[in-house]
Amino acid sequence: MDPNILWQARNDGSALQEEDIQQLRSSIRGTVVLKNEASEEEYNAAVTRWNNVSIRLATLVVYVEDEQDIVKCVEFVNKHYLDVAVCSHGRHSYHGASSSTGMVIDLGRMRRVSVDKEAMTVTAQGGCIARDVELPLEAEGLATVFGAVNETGIGGLTLGGGVGFLTGAHGLAADNLVSARMVLANGQVVTASDDENSDLFWAIRGAGPNFGIVTEFKYRVHKQGPVFWQMLFYSPDKLKDCVSIVNQMHNISLAQKGGDFQVMMAYLTPPGYPDLHPGLRIFYNGPEEKAKELAAPAYALGPLSVSGGMCNFSDTTRIPPYLEFEGFDRYAASSAHLDYPLDENLLLEVFTMFRNVIHKYGHHLLHPSKCILDLRNYEKVASVPIDATAYSGRFDVAWMIPDLQWDDPAMDSTMRMEVTSITAHIRERVREAKGGHVNGPRDATAIYPNISAGGEEKAKSVFGPNLPRLQVLKRKYDPDFIWNKWFPIVPA
């Protein structure tokens, strides 16, 4: 089936009549913001995203109040054959995740959370951001797995896999999902779990945006106390020294059974400095003394500055001060995997490429533009069979993530090209190292979907060997290809 035929058949709703809009409004409790009717301020607020590159001028945005509102919206989409996108919170580098020129169903008003300490679960509505769930859990001495930033919507994060600093201990956010209540493409409301609609439950844990709108997530939770959290920045001349210890740091992480010690490397310009500096982010789910013992190689390099210490877990998912800037809210990010042991020469090549981009475009790029080397322990993720859920990236690999941030719309395509050229170089070098192929089910082009631009042509890189089964399930649950954003799966 040609996805372009299905996409082109859907319309932007510009031909909707006033009576159509009134019918929608009268059928829901929520609010309809109409492009040609709302004030400029109201409309801009409805379509603005964390990444301004992602803004699409939707004909109508519906702020739903409850599950029944979502059902009515889906029925309206089907009746008028509209293009549609779903916005949990809109914090993604790719526009297709939550923007549409037709209808946007915005879940932002659905943020109720309920903690069941006896059952060790938490239930959260689909419009929650991670902080909405983290804080009430923390008050009970509990936590579940979300991402690195607590302003991220739990919907897209969970349905695409979801990795964070507790992933080493507890797996993906999707691995901690107990059940999900969903509105399907035909407007039907179902529960997906191991016991109900188990094929759908398999699919949404890694490919969820392709199968419906989750109105309610239920997660397993875990006991959680204070953690150790520090950011170490080094002088620019220490880049090679930092790279020289990354394999050692990863091996130390692997040696700590339980996944409690996690490390990430960053290459960015800290506030008050004129150029890029290497940095290491240290996380340990335990006491400071043990953390510093494990991270001894990082401290031995002589950091220029050290910030952080023992803190609540929720403090680790706040955006750090050195990344908080007003404006410069246009982003491009991509990802590519690297196998252990990491090739230090390749890492230096990549960091040099990134530095050249920063120097080339100078004033266009904000200081928080960064290149991240994710060294976190993915053994727990890799211990789950690749076909156990739709999420196929079940390997203990490192991820390189170039992330550019700018403010001039004229630079959008250039910045996207620069980011993808870096990850394309990595993938080519990975292929060369493996003689043009890889062993097993992982392709050298594999990407992490929650930090990459979407597109149907990349579905194979995201879903790997699980794609054929997903295409069959897509035909069952969304034969008309309503959910065609993010990394769309074409029905078999």
From Swiss-Prot:
Needed co-factor(s): FAD
Q: Pfam families given for it? A: FAD_binding_4
Q: Any idea which UniProt keywords this protein has?
A: FAD, Flavoprotein, Oxidoreductase
| Description of what induces expression | Expression is significantly up-regulated at the end of late growth phase, in the presence of Butyrolactone I. Expression is positively regulated by the pgm cluster-specific transcription factor pgmR.
Q: List the SUPFAM superfamilies.
A: FAD-binding/transporter-associated domain-like (SSF56176)
Keyword Metal-binding part of the UniProt annotation = no
Query: For this protein, what is the EC number?
Result: 1.1.1.-
Q: PANTHER family under this entry?
A: BINDING OXIDOREDUCTASE, PUTATIVE (AFU_ORTHOLOGUE AFUA_1G17690)-RELATED, FAD-BINDING PCMH-TYPE DOMAIN-CONTAINING PROTEIN
Query: Any idea what this protein is called?
Result: FAD-linked oxidoreductase pgmH
Organism the protein comes from: Aspergillus terreus
